[in-house]
C-alpha cells in the first residue's frame, strides 16, 4: 500500500531504476563515443543519490513523480554538508541527475521537470593557463627521459590545437584532411559528439611526424593512461620553473587564451573547441589584461578625433 501511495509500484518509474537503465546503456558506449571517466561519474552520482534518499527519506528508492525543486536543493546541500564536496564538484555531480530527470520528463514519465525551476551554480573559477613564455620554456627544455618528452610533446600538441586529452588519444590518420594544401584535424569530441576542426600549425605537424615510427595501429599517438601523462607534465613544468598547477587540460585553456589574445574571434575559438555555444567559451577562455589593453587601445585610436571637446571652466 505504501509503495502504491508513493508511486513505487512496478508500473512506475523510480529514480534509481532510471539511473540503472541509463548506466547500463552508457556502459555499452564506453570506448566508442563515451569516456570511461564519464561513466564512472554516473556510477558515483547514482551512489550519492541512493545514499541521499536513504539519509533524507529513510527509503531505498523513490518515484520520479515525487521529485521537486526541494529534492534537488536538499540533494545539493547533502553533497555539501554531508559528503563535503566543493560547489564546483556539486555542480558536476548534479549534471547526471539533471540528465536522468530531464530525459524522463521529455519521455512523458513525469509531468514536470524540477530542474526547469532550479539552477545549480557551477561556481566558475579562474582557469589556469600558460603564457607564451612558459610554453616556450616547456618547448625548448631538453628531456633525457623519453616518457617525459612524449608527455611534454602531447601537452604541446594540445596547446597548439586546443584538443582535449581523450580526443587526441582517439585521433587516427583518417582525421587528417588536406584543405587548400594544408593539413587539418577534423573529428568529433568524445565527450559531446560535437564536430570540431582545426588547421595544423608547424609545432603539431612536427610532433605528428616525430612519433610516426612509434605507431602500433592507425592512431596518431600510442598514449597510455591520463594519470601517468599528467604526472610527467607536472614534473616538466616544475623543471621549467613554472609554479602553476599544470595538468593536461591546461593545454586546452592555454590554446583558447592565446587564440583570443592574438585576435581570433571568439566565434572561431568556440567552433574549434567544439563548444555548442559561446557562453561556454567565455567561461573556458580567460581574456588577459594584454588582450583587454590591446582592445581598448584599438577602440581609442578609432574613436580619437570623433570625440567632442570638453568646455572650459566657467
Feature roles, as predicted:
Residues 119, 125-128, 134, 170-207:
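Conserved tyrosine-mediated DNA breakage-rejoining catalytic core shared by Y-recombinases
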Residues 299-314:
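C-terminal secondary-structure termini that scaffold catalytic or DNA-interacting sites
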Amino acid at each position: 500500500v505504501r509503495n502504491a501511495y508513493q508511486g513505487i509500484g512496478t508500473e512506475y518509474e523510480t529514480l534509481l531504476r532510471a539511473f540503472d537503465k541509463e548506466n547500463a546503456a552508457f556502459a555499452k558506449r564506453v570506448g566508442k563515443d563515451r569516456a570511461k571517466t564519464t561513466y564512472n561519474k554516473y556510477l558515483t552520482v547514482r551512489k550519492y543519490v541512493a545514499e541521499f534518499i536513504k539519509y533524507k527519506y529513510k527509503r531505498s528508492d523513490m518515484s520520479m513523480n515525487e521529485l521537486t525543486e526541494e529534492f534537488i536543493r536538499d540533494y545539493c546541500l547533502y553533497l555539501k554538508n554531508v559528503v563535503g564536496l566543493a560547489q564546483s564538484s556539486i555542480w558536476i555531480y548534479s549534471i547526471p541527475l539533471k540528465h536522468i530527470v530531464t530525459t524522463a520528463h521529455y519521455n512523458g514519465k513525469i509531468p514536470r521537470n524540477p530542474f526547469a525551476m532550479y539552477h545549480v551554480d557551477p561556481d566558475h573559477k579562474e582557469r589556469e593557463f600558460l603564457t607564451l613564455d612558459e610554453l616556450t620554456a616547456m618547448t625548448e627544455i631538453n628531456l633525457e627521459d623519453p616518457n617525459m618528452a612524449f608527455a611534454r610533446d602531447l601537452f604541446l600538441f594540445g596547446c597548439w590545437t586546443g584538443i582535449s586529452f581523450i580526443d587526441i588519444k582517439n585521433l587516427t590518420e583518417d582525421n587528417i584532411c588536406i584543405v587548400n594544401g594544408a593539413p587539418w584535424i577534423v573529428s568529433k569530441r568524445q565527450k559531446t559528439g560535437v564536430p570540431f576542426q582545426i588547421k595544423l600549425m608547424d609545432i603539431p605537424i612536427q610532433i605528428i611526424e616525430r612519433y610516426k615510427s612509434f605507431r602500433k595501429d592507425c592512431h596518431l599517438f600510442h598514449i597510455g593512461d591520463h594519470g601517468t601523462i599528467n604526472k610527467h607534465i607536472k614534473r616538466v613544468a616544475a623543471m621549467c620553473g613554472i609554479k602553476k598547477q599544470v595538468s593536461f587540460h591546461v593545454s586546452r585553456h592555454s590554446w583558447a587564451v592565446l587564440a583570443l589574445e592574438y585576435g581570433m574571434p571568439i566565434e572561431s575559438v568556440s567552433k574549434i573547441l567544439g563548444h555548442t555555444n559561446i557562453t561556454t567559451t567565455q567561461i573556458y577562455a580567460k581574456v588577459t589584461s594584454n588582450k583587454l589593453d590591446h582592445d581598448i587601445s584599438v577602440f581609442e585610436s578609432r574613436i580619437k578625433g570623433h570625440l567632442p571637446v570638453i568646455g572650459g571652466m566657467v
